[in-house]
């Protein structure tokens, strides 16, 4: 394919994504869901015309990881910390932790019932289905009240972090024993210390850079640190979340030496520019990731009745567990928080991180696709329902 044709296609996808984003904001249909359908439509058209296609599955993990970093960073930059929000933060953290753990356990039991495979293997395969997608949830809740929006941002970001930690924990501990939890504790303390040092270093660096190109450098450092932390199996997404929160709330710190050496006059201006940069960059990456994921899917996979039955049981588990926790434990307004539990980018990334020999027969890309579509439609229904009641 000639280079100018490729340029036309890529720029056309960005324009279409921009228009779909505007359409999504007016209709409350998740924009990423529309992008999936664009990818499916392109694939079906090419298959119909018998045009050969490229295998794009190999670039999905890298593209998705960079997109995830930017989306979590963008979401963290929107969070203003105040002491009175401690209850909200704790509530969202506990919701993310408890719901994820129980959902993973329930899905693992379903997988074991269907496959009779070892429970440890079933847990690893179940983990992707327990993790909420901040990439899909955060852009979809822009119209909610500030408290509900912040709850979703915190919960989905915590869910991403905990899900990755849990997945790595299962992958690196074939036999779970006391030492496994000690190692996890050490890793958690290590990442918190690294996050604190890293936040101070980057804020100092931003203040000292006088060259007009600085934000690409900061994002590149974020991505590099994320990658290095992943090599050592550390929950690297914590660094991204911590830096975004720290940057947006640095001016609230009253410690005089900190204000003297780290704060600078144009911090708020740089913060606004960085937020714009991360938002536009995540928009581009989200566009290509979900279009490519839709492109790699085969719509005929959804015709498998056994897969639909199994997927239906997973859906029931997801929403029953969420309802019980939010209603009787967290005791928060269910509308529309109950419905905002989409699966998406993290789910896909974790699934493709599984070595082929560790994937169970029941967990396939078709099942993944079905759960992503179904949870997206449920979220869309919940947000549209909340909008009507608000009117």
Indicate where each model-derived feature is located:
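Transmembrane helical cores of multi-pass secondary ion antiporters/exchangers
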Residues: 1-391
